[in-house]
From Swiss-Prot:
Alphabetical GO biological process terms: hydrogen peroxide catabolic process
Keywords: Calcium, Heme, Hydrogen peroxide, Iron, Metal-binding, Oxidoreductase, Peroxidase
Native organism: Daucus carota
The protein's name in its UniProt record: Peroxidase 1
Protein family membership: Belongs to the peroxidase family. Classical plant (class III) peroxidase subfamily.
Lineage of the organism: Eukaryota, Viridiplantae, Streptophyta, Embryophyta, Tracheophyta
Cofactor note: Binds 2 calcium ions per subunit.
Length: 14
């Protein structure tokens, strides 16, 4: 998966 996208989503989720 895209680490950048995943990280962004993860941050947004939190």
């Amino acid at each position: 998966w895209n680490e950048t996208s995943d990280k962004d989503l993860y941050t947004d989720s939190r």
